[in-house]
């Protein structure tokens, strides 16, 4: 491994890399862009899908006490009135009296980021929900909202899931999907945007067990980021003071990542108590509770909620993985992404475009594709192709050379060490899978 170079412009380097290599682009760029909106390119869509798949594997696939849900994005006002969003889902908005720009008051430290003025209007509550009309007839009866979080669909489906899965507390409902918040000051690339993807789980527990499960999920979710390659010193836990808690929370702890602008929220774990189920039960008239046959009693479960942003997590993984190494006197950019997150796990690289070599290379590609995501690259020198794969985070490169035609073996190159190993084609799939764990 080469000598590590100190990096002081990490955010700019990663966002430039993201655009140049096809991780994400400003949306509607040919029309001048659309603030706070991004389109995920060929590499980014793979990474984002891998982040969501890794979360789903950890939270649903590897457990028997959590099931999945995909609830509607559009919802009627009744849901958001009951949840408290119509009244309390706000940020403090101020206008700069000098340049007229609008800002979120608690994020600017009394100084306008645009012009430096310290003169602002009085703060006023700005609701972050997107309001729209459903159907062809305008009026209050047609009002709908884009969901600002995925959580409420899991609460309103509590009784449905309880009845159809025969689960009993403690159990969870998990969901991955788009949410929308009309942020006053979207910023820092894909970190804070108005359209984003969430990965949330509502874990329903007996009230007496809530604190135990709250601590359990803090530890479990913190460990997930470590297992996927984020260094311990890049993460910290921030427990909210009582005065800072959301209206529904009995306790909240954020997992924070050391972003280039400082530590900021990556995921929040909250003890929501029985607030949500009680609110929706009162508003709808439907009992949202569990009957404990063993003790012959009904109770409203408490809810422990680990809530993560998929797009925000993707950005943290990219920032944590980016390095510049000096290898053999040359500087290379490399994304040391965990193999489960990399856009491609393997790149198949024929040494030449000659038909017999390309034919064998496509045979090798066909062996690998059922097992891992593969790139196939014929262009430029092999050294440049290695550097390209390093820069996009591909853990392994498989090179097919002219000796391969004779000995039915290929060269497997490691992204992180640049070490190369000769492997028989018959053993390639097993070797690759073993190295990608």
For each predicted feature, which ranges?
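NTP/phosphate- and nucleic-acid-binding module
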Residues: 1-437
């Amino acid at each position: 491994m080469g000598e590590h170079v100190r990096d002081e412009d990490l955010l700019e380097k990663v966002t430039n890399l993201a655009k140049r290599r096809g991780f994400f682009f400003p949306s509607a760029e040919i029309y001048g862009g659309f603030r706070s909106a991004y389109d995920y390119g060929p590499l980014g869509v793979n990474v984002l899908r891998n982040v969501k798949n890794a979360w789903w594997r950890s939270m649903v696939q590897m457990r028997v006490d959590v099931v999945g849900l995909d609830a509607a994005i559009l919802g009627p006002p009744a849901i958001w009135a009951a949840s408290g969003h119509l009244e309390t889902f706000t940020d403090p908005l101020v206008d700069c009296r000098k340049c007229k720009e609008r800002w979120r008051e608690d994020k600017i430290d009394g100084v306008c980021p645009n012009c430096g003025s310290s003169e602002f209007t009085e703060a006023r509550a700005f609701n972050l929900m997107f309001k729209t009309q459903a159907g062809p007839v305008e009026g209050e009866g047609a009002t709908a909202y884009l969901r600002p979080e995925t959580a409420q669909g899991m609460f309103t489906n509590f009784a449905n899931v309880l009845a159809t899965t025969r689960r009993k507390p403690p159990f969870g409902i998990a969901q991955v999907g788009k949410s929308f918040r009309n942020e006053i000051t979207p910023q820092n690339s894909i970190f804070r945007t108005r359209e984003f993807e969430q990965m949330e789980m509502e874990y329903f527990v007996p009230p007496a067990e809530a604190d135990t499960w709250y601590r359990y999920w803090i530890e479990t979710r913190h460990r997930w980021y470590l297992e996927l390659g984020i260094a311990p010193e890049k993460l910290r836990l921030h427990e909210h003071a009582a005065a800072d808690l959301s209206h529904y929370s009995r306790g909240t702890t954020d997992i924070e990542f050391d972003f280039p602008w400082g530590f900021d929220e990556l995921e929040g774990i909250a003890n929501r108590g029985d607030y949500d189920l009680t609110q929706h039960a009162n508003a709808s008239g439907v009992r949202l509770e569990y009957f404990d046959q063993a003790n012959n009693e009904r109770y409203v479960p408490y809810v422990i909620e680990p809530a993560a942003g998929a797009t925000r997590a993707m950005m943290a993984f990219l920032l944590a993985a980016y390095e510049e190494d000096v290898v053999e006197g040359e500087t290379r950019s490399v994304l040391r992404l965990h193999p489960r997150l990399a856009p491609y796990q393997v790149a198949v690289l024929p040494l030449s475009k000659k038909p017999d070599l390309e034919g064998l290379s496509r045979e090798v590609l066909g062996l690998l594709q059922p097992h891992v995501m593969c790139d196939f690259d014929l262009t430029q020198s092999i050294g440049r192709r290695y550097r390209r794969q390093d820069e996009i985070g591909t853990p392994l490169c498989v090179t097919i050379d002219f000796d391969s035609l004779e000995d039915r073996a290929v060269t497997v190159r490691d992204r992180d060490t640049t070490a190369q190993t000769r492997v028989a084609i018959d053993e390639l799939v097993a070797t690759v899978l073993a190295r990608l764990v």
